């Protein structure tokens, strides 16, 4: 990890640089890993550490960065470096982390029929009542113009709910002469090209919501040889959806009723449906209990479906699309990472903070599902408690030099197990 940070460029005037670039990145990571929520709170913690007899937070940041800084930098100094660092460099680190996990086979258990599940979806990362920058997207609401920023994310997901970013594409207005705003459908080909370049031979199944149920997206998946499971709704493919429900009643042999825990599931599938020149299988799942509560989902896929695979594809494939929303976006917005907070007024720096947040989230997921997994369940319990204990440890307990020594850590391999 440190050699990736060492390779980052530094455009600052070198004769006047006080804080090492790696120290800057670890300082930014500590904002998210301590759930501080802002640069201002980071400054308060730096002042508190300087007032103590022993400066444990400073020593630990130096230990992690391999530096010998004399004090913790101010949040504005951190922002200066991230303003000068082109965001394309930090953008490469989250997918490199995933590549490393794949090479050490730590994520093999997460495959579904040999395929890694990649969820692609967009989320808002900032909303403003005034124009924030020239890249802002705009939307009229109640007669007023809302300015906002959007990012299209691709995350590799695991059965127990871990999410790792493998690609990000910011949806933003970059051409002043354009007659249309950028949108997530337009951003998808850009994101897909990045993923294919970084993971050219990775066996992938993409999970997408109904917005992407169209000819262009299916053609894109075919071009990159990606399998797909896409939400299937009448509002997006009305003709194919009507045909699916008509044929479903004529194929009773393609229906399976099963029970999972206290709920029943009725699953049906119809092969050889068509949209334009794309053929696919439609399948759905009606989940209900003894009290009459019902939940309905439907999907389309190019994967082979039968009575042996439909339960797995529905429950561990199609329904897992929500992982990016629940364990990804919601956690990053509300569990202490404060994804929607404006960490910088500079657009380039804001992107860098976004990528650093993805790195911090990945590191903490590996920690809570790996080294301290047992203690997390039995003692810590919640992420809120974890952030409190982690921050307390970072401020008051010195990290062993051996724990961050590259030579000592080289033989270590991460092993995760399904829950």
Q: Which residues make up each language-model segment?
A:
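Active-site-proximal, Lys/Arg-enriched surface segment
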Residues: 75-160
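A short, flexible helix-boundary coil/loop motif
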Residues: 8, 47-49, 57, 254-271, ...
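Short amphipathic alpha-helical "interface-anchor" segments enriched in bulky aromatics
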Residues: 1, 308-343
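An anionic, glycine-rich sequence signature occurring as long contiguous blocks
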Residues: 227-321
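Short, conserved catalytic/metal-binding motifs centered on acidic residues
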Residues: 27-28, 42-43, 74, 114-125, ...
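Electropositive, glycine- and tryptophan-enriched low-complexity nucleic-acid-binding patches
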Residues: 140-203
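Domain-level cores of phosphate- or acyl-group-handling catalytic modules
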Residues: 178-239
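Gly/serine-rich nucleotide phosphate-binding loop at the start of the catalytic core
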Residues: 1-70
